[in-house]
Amino acid sequence: MLKPSDKWSWYFDKPSGRLMLDLGDRYLFQTNLSDKLLVDCAFSYNDFTVDDASAFQTFKECLSSLDLSEYRRDELTLYCVAAKRFHKPVQPKSWFFHSTGSDYQPSEGELVQLQNGLNQGLFIVLEAGDNASLVSCVELEGFMLSGSKSLSYGEAIKVMHDRMSTAARMNTLMPMALVG
């Protein structure tokens, strides 16, 4: 089980073009954040802070109910912490998702549902804004945005709140197979 440590540190790895987290004992975690998605401070050495540890706990607890292996849950948790701290501010890309017609207000760490004509899926809220939030894809197989674009597991996108619904409703919206 992965536990945050004050010995962890963030740095940018030029050869891979990715933000890395040094976990100590010669263990490294490569995030899914490339240089074009990072704020300027990500290109220098950064300690793993108390805020990072708090975000780690928040995201890990929220993801604990999902049917993911411990390894995949830890991976997603670290992707979320990295994006929360180092992802560049971006404009919403809500046109990829159907409107729900609601004025839903998600909170950080909450699981939400997004859908379009191709699929529906779970996302975790990384940063909750007034009208839009940065969310990360929780679907292991990714999420199709269009016929030619997709989000991979752990990839972040900013979406207007009127496209989101609570994940608690997802069970009623998902098709079920009757067995027996």
Curated annotation (Swiss-Prot):
Spell out the protein name for this chain. Cell division protein ZapC
Compartment(s) of residence? Cytoplasm
Report the Pfam families cross-referenced here. ZapC_C (PF07126), ZapC_N (PF21083)
One GO process term, biological-process aspect: FtsZ-dependent cytokinesis
The domain of life is Bacteria
Keyword Acetylation assigned: no
Matching entries from InterPro entries are given as:
ZapC, ZapC_C, ZapC_N
Family according to the record: Belongs to the ZapC family.
Known partners and oligomeric status: Interacts directly with FtsZ.
**What do the Gene Ontology cellular component annotations say?**
cytoplasm
Q: What does this protein do?
A: Contributes to the efficiency of the cell division process by stabilizing the polymeric form of the cell division protein FtsZ. Acts by promoting interactions between FtsZ protofilaments and suppressing the GTPase activity of FtsZ.
User: Keywords on this record?
Assistant: Cell cycle, Cell division, Cytoplasm, Septation
